[in-house]
């Protein structure tokens, strides 16, 4: 019989994560690496694990994520949203808890585009009076 999988997509800045949950012991793999080895920072690890800890499902699911684009911070946020969406698919009763914690909301903040005549999005060239 085929193993049960739950799927969630997460996006943050320019990062896109595809997250698969399967019943298991609670391992988290990102791009075929262990979570700590991939992200490298404890704070980002905590961000990724937040949805599992809030719902109390930390040891019930194995998480396998493939993530591309953006930097590691954006990727961590994308994985977090993907996990939250997959948890709702696995158990719809978790939706109010995740919604209240704000884990089902896609963060709309994006990098502002650079404008011509400026050095960056808002940074103007140095002004000289004389």
Swiss-Prot record:
One of its GO terms (molecular function) is structural constituent of ribosome. Signal peptide: none annotated. PROSITE patterns: RIBOSOMAL_S9 (PS00360). One of its GO terms (biological process) is translation. GO terms for cellular component: cytosolic small ribosomal subunit. Keywords: Ribonucleoprotein, Ribosomal protein. Residues 105-130 are annotated as: Disordered. Residues 111-130 have a biased composition (Basic residues). It comes from the Bacteria. NCBIfam families: PRK00132.1 (NF001099). Belongs to the universal ribosomal protein uS9 family. This is Small ribosomal subunit protein uS9. The gene is rpsI.
């Amino acid at each position: 019989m085929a193993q049960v999988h739950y799927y969630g997509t997460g996006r943050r800045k320019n990062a896109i994560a595809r997250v698969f949950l399967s019943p298991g012991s609670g391992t988290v793999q990102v791009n075929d690496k262990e979570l700590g080895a991939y992200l490298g920072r404890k704070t980002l690890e905590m961000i990724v694990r937040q949805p599992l800890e809030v719902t109390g499902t930390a040891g019930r699911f194995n998480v396998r994520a493939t993530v591309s684009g953006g930097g590691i911070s954006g990727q961590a946020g994308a994985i977090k949203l993907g996990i939250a969406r997959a948890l709702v698919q696995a158990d719809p009763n978790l939706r109010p808890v995740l919604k209240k914690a704000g884990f089902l909301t896609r963060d709309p903040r994006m990098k502002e585009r650079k404008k011509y005549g400026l050095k960056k999005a808002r940074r103007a060239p140095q002004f000289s009076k004389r």
